């Protein structure tokens, strides 16, 4: 993606992480969100006129969101609906970029599901390895790329190959590529999804402890400050612990930035005692 589309996708990615990684009580499971976003992507791919209408920069964003909600609102859950609205409201350089963004967020949602079971590393590795297997076996590659072969036959083939050998999220992602190649070769599809997985894993996760809950604005400012400090996108996992008295403690890997009142008092007492 280029220009406005790249910026819009980055903003939608951040919104998706906020909704999926830090869900509110009763929120949709991420695997359900991913499946529903894939369904919306498929519908937009099948109806180019609808895709053009939802990506038209001349149409007021609120009208496009209303149209999307009328079309998909009863088919998808609250989190998926909010992400569709985010994508529809954004500005895209190409019409196809809108549906590409929805697919990307669908992949992201499934990766979040894998992360919850501490399996996201396995999923990335399995995607890469299965992609290499497909590329190295012409008969398998041709079977998956064959447009005359019924889709369900290809899905069953994938399920047989991956059964009991891969994480369910890996199976879901490969199945998505087989059902909806979206004009890509198998190699291109695996490269796209592996790239999304790599991007997700490369982010830094900061474990933040505060005495009181942070506001959304405080979260945003802290995330931006840490991202600028480390030169990479930083996601926050925030915990509230009144015992620190005030201030904030940030841990990224082995590095700890301790700005808590409890730490300052302990340091002061130590200096006075020396």
UniProtKB/Swiss-Prot annotation:
Cellular component, GO, one term: plasma membrane
Alphabetical UniProt keywords: ATP synthesis, Cell membrane, CF(1), Hydrogen ion transport, Ion transport, Membrane, Transport
InterPro entries in the record: ATP_synth_OSCP/delta_N_sf (IPR026015), ATPase_OSCP/d_CS (IPR020781), ATPase_OSCP/dsu (IPR000711)
Chief location category: membrane
Gene3D superfamilies tied to this protein: N-terminal domain of the delta subunit of the F1F0-ATP synthase
Protein's cellular compartments: Cell membrane
PANTHER family: ATP SYNTHASE DELTA CHAIN (PTHR11910)
NCBIfam families: ATP_synt_delta, PRK13430.1
Role description: F(1)F(0) ATP synthase produces ATP from ADP in the presence of a proton or sodium gradient. F-type ATPases consist of two structural domains, F(1) containing the extramembraneous catalytic core and F(0) containing the membrane proton channel, linked together by a central stalk and a peripheral stalk. During catalysis, ATP synthesis in the catalytic domain of F(1) is coupled via a rotary mechanism of the central stalk subunits to proton translocation.
Subunit structure: F-type ATPases have 2 components, F(1) - the catalytic core - and F(0) - the membrane proton channel. F(1) has five subunits: alpha(3), beta(3), gamma(1), delta(1), epsilon(1). F(0) has three main subunits: a(1), b(2) and c(10-14). The alpha and beta chains form an alternating ring which encloses part of the gamma chain. F(1) is attached to F(0) by a central stalk formed by the gamma and epsilon chains, while a peripheral stalk is formed by the delta and b chains.
Name assigned to this protein: ATP synthase subunit delta
Source species: Acidothermus cellulolyticus (strain ATCC 43068 / DSM 8971 / 11B)
